[in-house]
């Protein structure tokens, strides 16, 4: 009989501690024999913690080649317990089906950019380092440089407003178009300087370039569309009693998760308060674990300032059939 892992004994080589790591593990409640999915492997912190918490197996997914390489290194230390798949979590259903997996017991999603991506200047995610204006989480597709140099002013303003909620989005777009007439904008620090020249400093000390960089990153990677696809896939994949844990870092992401879980954790409303709900109304597919979500404790915020806007929302799958597109909330 093989000894199970020691709870809390996370692999020493996995030094990165993800935001709300222990809370995510608690929400998923791993048990021996469970099949779990880490849909956003990143630096591997959640996967390592899950593997250490029970004699479970984990299927890890990431589109970033560097993350996939890290995953294979971790898998070598856990023979037969960790499989790493190259792809996006929005496609997890087909990725897992290709390996014969059609039901799982838990899914963890950490939405947005990972710490290794932010801290690598060559990836172009950060306005703190000089690097190519890329921002792709994978290795294919449109870059941030393509957007700022090729889209028209109105479309750039719309992206910055819609995905960054930047109230000075028109100023930003106007400044970008004016600068690119002189020369293409290809470096992160160049773009940051352009944005800072037209967006005033905020009282909370957040860099004026923050919202614009967030907006471009979301647009480049279709992050909100990916999140919607991932949530729908999780609903179909989770077995009754399975858990979903989603960590978000800004209001746009959190709104998508909150609305999805709200709609899936409530029966369809009656057409009138004087009439019963329709007999064919879809039953709730999730039960909320923490209605308002979980935020980092003061100790974690002190140790990791990047955690300041994080929120964990989690839910348990019921036995009701997954909703179809167009089903009432």
Curated annotation (Swiss-Prot):
It is found in: Cytoplasm. Its main location: cytoplasm. Its EC number is 2.1.1.199. Pfam families: Methyltransf_5. It catalyses: cytidine(1402) in 16S rRNA + S-adenosyl-L-methionine = N(4)-methylcytidine(1402) in 16S rRNA + S-adenosyl-L-homocysteine + H(+). S-adenosyl-L-methionine binds at residues 44-46, 62, 110, 117. SUPFAM superfamilies: Putative methyltransferase TM0872, insert domain, S-adenosyl-L-methionine-dependent methyltransferases. InterPro entries: RsmH (IPR002903), SAM-dep_MeTrfase_MraW_recog (IPR023397), SAM-dependent_MTases_sf (IPR029063). Keywords: Cytoplasm, Methyltransferase, rRNA processing, S-adenosyl-L-methionine, Transferase. It comes from the Bacteria. GO terms for molecular function: rRNA (cytosine-N4-)-methyltransferase activity. Transmembrane segments: none annotated. Specifically methylates the N4 position of cytidine in position 1402 (C1402) of 16S rRNA. Belongs to the methyltransferase superfamily. RsmH family. PANTHER family: 12S RRNA N4-METHYLCYTIDINE METHYLTRANSFERASE, S-ADENOSYL-METHYLTRANSFERASE MRAW. This is Ribosomal RNA small subunit methyltransferase H. It comes from Rhodospirillum centenum (strain ATCC 51521 / SW). The lineage of its organism: Bacteria, Pseudomonadati, Pseudomonadota, Alphaproteobacteria, Rhodospirillales.
